[in-house]
């Protein structure tokens, strides 16, 4: 049934499927055409190559073909089917390889030639199936034969000096025809034109010389091997009548002309030009009996040492001279001779022979495939056929049906060329030598077939991998494979789309995680561990200064600060890992929660009594500067000791609690003070017309009546990097010159206090001058006094620059309480000098709170000098506070109630205005402490130590006393 009948039957049947359903007609046709596409006509993949029978092993001729159904392979010899009846000569393997065995020989050349002719010839491979037949190209089988016996052996010869010598040699029969070479004394004999030449297979010596004596041997060589003849002994003897030549002095020879006879090169075994010599004889003597021509080639004009070649001339006045080479410069001269006598040489003439094209092609031209190229190599033609100097070679690539013709020129003595092979096919090359006259005779064409990858892999089993790749490529080109791949790809994309859809539908979007704003992570930190944030604890900073309760302007509007807490985009650096309970947390006053959450105390602190004498040793560098101003604000000075009732020294207490120097991002850093202790005291007048005056003496207080003042006591905690012994070893600095004077004898003015340091090794005590007001005033009176006249001169820019200092701390509850108690009437002035002098700057206005500048205080002091009954002694002016934050500005909104002496309403207004939007740093804690101090409330924390314990402890409740 043909293909058309099958299609008709399929259409008539309606495309019934396996399940009895009708399939679409195009799908049925696709399957039918796919099945038919499997059948293909035969195609030769591996062509047979030329083989040479040599040795005892068989020769192999390979032939591979593809097709569906699998084609049948048969071999043809010289166009006739090869008979496989004699397996000893021909054997066909299952894969199509033909084995050719060497037939046995009988020793006679004629019989051997007849036997070998039965297997020698051109072999062709033929592959056929029901779709067609494919024929490979022909491959020639040759047999290399070289018999053992020489037909003519050289014989021993004895020659006389000056005579010619001939050694004959007949090489053995062989195929290919063997070449003959002569050896003398075990070395190749060097041939010289005109002296030693090879004619046929015989060696000819024109004029025998003594150095020609030796052992000569003839050697025959072909592909089958080489054969050596017997050694022949050649002896050169002197003639019996040999005598010295006599000089003919009376004869003179004049060489007149040297003429080239044959301008065209002569093809043959003796190529070379010939010249005609003409000379003239003069002299009284009779003419000479014979003449000899002497010539030599002059390759270099500076070369004068080459030997002369002698040739006997036949004529008496002219003669023909041969044995020359084209393209050489020769020197010629003639010598007369008569028997044993000879005359002087004639003059020398020069003749330049022109170059001719080489008379022989290059030898041993071969082709071999490379990596995408074809390598052509050859050997130069024989020296006698150069006909000049070889200047290069011309290479021709013969064109065919698939490749165009091309040619290349190789310059110099290079004897190989690489030709790029752009496509597979047959490459045939010819090579010719080039001289100054042009290209010579080209060589016979040499061909090379470049096969495709599939053919090479099938012929060479080692390249089976590349052939498999070609098969895979051909398979992937089939339509059914392409259709199946497209369907699989579509299904894969559909599955990926479904997975992505389901994941997006059920997926959980991750939030920003721990990357929060600065204020948010601070609040979250205090919620997680609020034991490190005090609520009106020993980290509160007291504030003092004149307050203006009549103004209602906002602090933020004065300082140009946005009252809102800016939420910057910086990511928090807070570590959320659980912290060790042994590592305490430092107070954070930069946020709302850090300012409101108080640390628990083990016992309520004890307020120091104003009557208690205070003596503290100050470092020497406090007195080394003349500036009375400290480097930080007096209200926010260095932190004092946590509890005056601690049994341990400051450094030991910190070590006992494992207090470490920890710095939290965007939190208050741990302050390292440069002084172990600081005592600040300053007094502010209650009336605008009264100012402070200088003290008459360092140890006396003014007996005059002075307004109520706020005295702030501060004691700096132990430094983390210094032990208590180092701090205790520092001497007490001398009293500043501005504080020295006549001591006062007023008992009420002797207000020197001696404080006991909370350490096992107390510091040496030294008396300090203390001011004692003769007229005590209430806390409200002292704090609600009229602001100082110099408080309006402090600028916010100077305060902003002071805010960058990190050497400030806060007041302890004891200091706040002491400040409140001393404000009634007893004032404890202290002396502290900043290690770094700072220029005076305008005052800063905290809404209703203002601080006088150094210049203002100085003016007040000068003005108060004349009114000694109203002012006290100002030992240490206050330090400037940093620039207020929006929280402090917002605090001013609740100050109006306090100005009307309505304490409950002021507290309510103050607390209600303290929201999280502006309570974001420690400045609000300072301002709130001022407000609490002004109302006269005392703060008693429940725990006196400074170590923050309990990571998840709840914050203590607020206590207002």
UniProtKB/Swiss-Prot annotation:
Cysteines engaged in disulfide bonds, as pairs: 63-125, 169-218
Residue span(s) of domain Ig-like C2-type: 42-142, 148-235
Domain Fibronectin type-III: 259-356, 358-453
Glycan attachment positions: 211, 257, 371, 400, 407, 691, 723, 772, 793
Stretches with biased composition (Polar residues): 623-634, 770-783
GO biological process terms on file: angiogenesis; blood vessel endothelial cell migration; establishment of endothelial barrier; negative regulation of blood vessel endothelial cell migration
Region (Disordered): 544-563, 600-634, 726-810
Record PROSITE patterns: FN3 (PS50853), IG_LIKE (PS50835)
Residue positions where Phosphoserine is found in the record: 823
Record GO cellular component, one term: external side of plasma membrane
InterPro entries named among the record's database cross-references: FN3_dom, FN3_sf, Ig-like_dom, Ig-like_dom_sf, Ig-like_fold, Ig_I-set, Ig_sub, Ig_sub2
UniProt entry keywords in alphabetical sequence: Angiogenesis, Developmental protein, Differentiation, Disulfide bond, Glycoprotein, Immunoglobulin domain, Phosphoprotein, Receptor, Repeat, Signal
SUPFAM superfamilies: Fibronectin type III, Immunoglobulin
Signal peptide: 1-37
Record's compositionally biased regions (Low complexity): 544-559, 755-769, 784-801
Positions of transmembrane segments: none
Molecular function in Gene Ontology: signaling receptor activity
UniProt-listed Pfam families: fn3, I-set, Ig_3
Function: Receptor for Slit proteins, at least for SLIT2, and seems to be involved in angiogenesis and vascular patterning. May mediate the inhibition of primary endothelial cell migration by Slit proteins. Involved in the maintenance of endothelial barrier organization and function.
Subunit note: Interacts with SLIT2 and ENAH.
Family indicated by similarity: Belongs to the immunoglobulin superfamily. ROBO family.
Protein name, UniProt field: Roundabout homolog 4
Biological source species: Rattus norvegicus (Rat)
């Amino acid at each position: 049934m043909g293909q058309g009948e099958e299609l008709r039957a399929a259409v008539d049947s309606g495309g019934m499927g396996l399940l009895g359903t009708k399939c679409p007609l195009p799908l049925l046709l696709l399957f039918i055409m796919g099945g038919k596409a499997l059948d293909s006509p035969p195609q030769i993949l591996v062509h047979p190559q030329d083989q040479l029978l040599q040795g005892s092993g068989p020769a192999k001729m390979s032939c591979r073909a593809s097709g569906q159904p699998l084609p049948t392979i048969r071999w043809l010899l010289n166009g006739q089917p090869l008979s496989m009846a004699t397996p000893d000569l021909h054997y066909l393997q299952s894969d199509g390889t033909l084995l050719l065995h060497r037939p046995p020989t009988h020793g006679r050349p004629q019989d051997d030639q007849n036997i070998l002719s039965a297997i020698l010839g051109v072999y062709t491979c033929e592959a056929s199936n029901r779709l067609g037949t494919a024929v490979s190209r022909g491959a020639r089988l040759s047999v290399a034969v070289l018999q053992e016996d020489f037909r003519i052996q050289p014989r021993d010869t004895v020659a006389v000096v000056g005579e010619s010598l001939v050694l004959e040699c007949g090489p053995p029969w062989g195929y290919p025809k063997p070449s003959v070479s002569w050896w003398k004394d075990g070395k190749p004999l060097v041939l010289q034109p005109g002296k030693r030449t090879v004619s046929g297979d015989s060696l000819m010596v024109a004029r025998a010389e003594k150095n020609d004596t030796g052992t000569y041997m003839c050697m025959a060589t072909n592909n089958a091997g080489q054969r050596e003849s017997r050694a022949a002994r050649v002896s050169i003897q002197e003639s019996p009548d040999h005598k010295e030549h006599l000089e003919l002095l009376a004869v003179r020879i004049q060489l007149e002309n040297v003429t080239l006879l044959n301008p065209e090169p002569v093809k043959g075994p003796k190529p070379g030009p010939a010249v005609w010599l003409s000379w003239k004889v003069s002299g009284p003597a009779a003419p000479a009996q014979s003449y000899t021509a002497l010539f030599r080639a002059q390759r270099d004009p500076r070369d004068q040492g080459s030997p002369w070649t002698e040739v006997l001339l036949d004529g008496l006045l002219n003669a023909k001279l041969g044995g020359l080479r084209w393209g050489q410069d020769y020197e010629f001269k003639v010598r007369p001779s008569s028997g044993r006598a000879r005359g002087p040489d004639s003059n020398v003439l020069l003749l330049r022979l022109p170059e001719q094209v080489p008379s022989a092609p290059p030898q041993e031209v071969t082709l071999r495939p490379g990596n995408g190229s074809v390598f052509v190599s050859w050997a130069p033609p024989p020296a006698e056929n150069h006909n000049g100097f070889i200047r290069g070679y011309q290479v021709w690539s013969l064109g065919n049906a698939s490749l165009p013709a091309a040619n290349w020129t190789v310059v110099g003595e290079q004897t190989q060329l690489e030709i790029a092979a752009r496509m597979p096919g047959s490459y045939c090359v010819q090579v010719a030598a080039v001289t100054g006259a042009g290209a010579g005779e080209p060589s016979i064409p040499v061909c090379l077939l470049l096969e495709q990858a599939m053919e090479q892999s099938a012929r060479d089993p080692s390249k089976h991998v590349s052939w498999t790749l070609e098969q895979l490529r051909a398979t992937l080109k089939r339509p059914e494979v392409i259709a199946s791949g497209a369907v699989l790809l579509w299904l894969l994309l559909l599955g990926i789309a479904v997975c992505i859809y389901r994941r997006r539908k059920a997926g959980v979007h991750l939030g920003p995680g721990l990357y929060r704003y600065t204020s948010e992570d601070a609040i979250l930190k205090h919620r997680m561990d609020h034991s490190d944030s005090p609520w009106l604890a020993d980290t509160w900073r007291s504030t003092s200064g004149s307050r203006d309760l009549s103004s209602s302007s906002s602090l933020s509007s004065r300082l140009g600060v946005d009252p809102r807490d800016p939420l910057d985009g910086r990511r928090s650096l807070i570590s959320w890992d659980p912290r060790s309970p042994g590592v305490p947390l430092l107070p954070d006053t930069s946020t709302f929660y850090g300012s409101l959450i108080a640390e628990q105390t083990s016992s309520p602190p004890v307020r120091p009594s104003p009557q208690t004498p205070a003596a503290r040793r100050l470092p020497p560098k406090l007195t080394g500067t003349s500036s009375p101003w400290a480097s930080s604000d007096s209200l926010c000075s260095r932190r004092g000791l946590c509890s005056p009732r601690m049994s341990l020294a400051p450094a030991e207490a910190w070590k006992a609690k494992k207090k470490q120097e920890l710095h939290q991002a965007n939190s208050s850093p741990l302050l390292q003070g440069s002084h172990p202790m600081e005592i600040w005291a300053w007094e502010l007048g209650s009336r605008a017309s009264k100012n402070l005056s200088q003290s008459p003496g360092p140890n006396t207080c003014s007996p005059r009546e002075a307004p109520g003042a706020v005295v702030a006591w501060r004691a700096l905690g132990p430094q983390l990097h210094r032990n208590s012994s180092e701090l205790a070893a520092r001497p007490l600095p001398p009293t500043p010159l501005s504080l020295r004077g006549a001591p006062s004898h007023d008992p009420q003015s002797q207000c020197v206090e001696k404080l006991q340091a909370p350490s096992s090794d107390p510091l040496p005590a030294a008396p300090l001058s203390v001011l004692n007001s003769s007229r005590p005033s209430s806390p409200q009176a002292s704090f609600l006094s009229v602001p100082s006249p110099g408080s309006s001169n402090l600028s916010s820019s100077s305060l902003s620059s002071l805010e960058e200092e990190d050497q400030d701390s806060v007041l302890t509850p004891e200091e706040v309480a002491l400040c409140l108690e001393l404000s009634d009437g007893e004032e404890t002035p202290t002396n502290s000098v900043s290690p770094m002098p700072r220029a005076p700057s305008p005052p800063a206005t905290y809404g209703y709170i203002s601080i006088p500048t150094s210049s203002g205080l100085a003016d007040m002091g000068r003005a108060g000098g004349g009114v000694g009954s109203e002012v006290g002694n100002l030992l240490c002016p206050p330090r400037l506070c940093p620039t207020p934050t929006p929280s402090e500005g917002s605090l001013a909104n609740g100050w109006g109630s306090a100005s009307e002496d309505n304490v409950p309403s002021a507290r309510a207004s103050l607390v209600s205005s303290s929201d999280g939007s502006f309570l974001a740093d420690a400045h609000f804690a300072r301002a709130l402490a001022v407000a609490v101090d002004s109302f006269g409330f005392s703060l008693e924390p429940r725990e006196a130590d400074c170590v923050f314990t309990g990571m998840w402890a709840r914050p203590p409740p607020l206590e207002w006393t």
